[in-house]
Amino acid sequence: MSSNTRVALVTGANKGIGFAIVRDLCRQFAGDVVLTARDVARGQAAVKQLQAEGLSPRFHQLDIIDLQSIRALCDFLRKEYGGLDVLVNNAAIAFQLDNPTPFHIQAELTMKTNFMGTRNVCTELLPLIKPQGRVVNVSSTEGVRALNECSPELQQKFKSETITEEELVGLMNKFVEDTKNGVHRKEGWSDSTYGVTKIGVSVLSRIYARKLREQRAGDKILLNACCPGWVRTDMGGPKAPKSPEVGAETPVYLALLPSDAEGPHGQFVTDKKVVEWGVPPESYPWVNA
C-alpha cells in the first residue's frame, strides 16, 4: 500500500453509529477506510456486510483499553500508509439505567473505556496524523447535561481555557475514587457516569486542539468533539428518534472538512453546528425553532 493513499479509521465500528460512519466514509472519502472493532469475528462480519453493499472497507482489530492492541494498529498504519489522515474515535460503552452493576463499578468501567481508552488512542495516533488531517471525538450532549449538574467549582475547572491534560486526568480519576467512597454527590459530581466520561472526552478534545495549534500550527489539522444525537443503537435504545445513519452525519461532516477549511477546531459540534461548550442543550437556538 502506498503512503500516498489516504486513510480514514473509525473505532468501535462493527455496529451502530460507528458502522454507519464507516459506510458513509466508504462512499465519500477519497481513500481507504479502516473499520476497527474489539471482536475480530464481529468486525469481519461488519466488513462483509458492507462488501455486500459494494463497498470496500478494510478491517483491523482494536481494543481501545489495550495498549498493545493500539500499538499494533499504529504499526499497521505506519507500514501501510505512513500515517493517518482521518481518525474518528467512536468506541464507547454505557450501562442501561436498570443495570444492577454497583454504581462505582459502572463508573470505573465506563471511565476506563470512554475516557482513558479514547485518550490512549489519541496519545498513540495523534503523532501519526498527516497535515490537513481530521480528528473527530464522538462525545455527547449527555456530557453537557452532566457538566451542568456538577458544582460551580467543577464547572469552572472543566470550562477553563488553560486546564491541562494532567489536571483533567486527575479529575476523571477523582470521580471514580469518589464513587468508590460513596461521596461523589458530596464532592459536586453528576450522577451520570456516562455523562462525566463524556465531559472528559469533550474537554480532552479542547486540550488536544490547543496543543495542535501550538505545536503543529502549519499542518492545518482540525480536531473537534461532537454529539451524534440520541440514536437507535444498543446503547441509545429503541425509543431514540434518530437512525444510526442520521447520527453519523455530524461525525462524517467533521471528518470530511475540506482541506482549505480553517475551522471548526477545538469545538463542540452537534447537528453540524458549533455550540458553546457548557451551554445546556435546551438552550441551543435551533432546538425550539
From Swiss-Prot:
Expressed in kidney (at protein level). The modification N6-1-carboxyethyl lysine is found at residue 239. The keyword Aminoacyl-tRNA synthetase does not apply. The active site is at 194 (proton acceptor). It catalyses: a secondary alcohol + NADP(+) = a ketone + NADPH + H(+); prostaglandin E1 + NADP(+) = 15-oxoprostaglandin E1 + NADPH + H(+); prostaglandin F2alpha + NADP(+) = prostaglandin E2 + NADPH + H(+); prostaglandin D2 + NADP(+) = 15-oxoprostaglandin D2 + NADPH + H(+). NADP(+) binds at residues 10-34, 63-64, 90, 194-198, 231-233. One of its GO terms (biological process) is vitamin K metabolic process. This is Carbonyl reductase [NADPH] 1. It comes from Sus scrofa. The lineage of its organism: Eukaryota, Metazoa, Chordata, Craniata, Vertebrata.
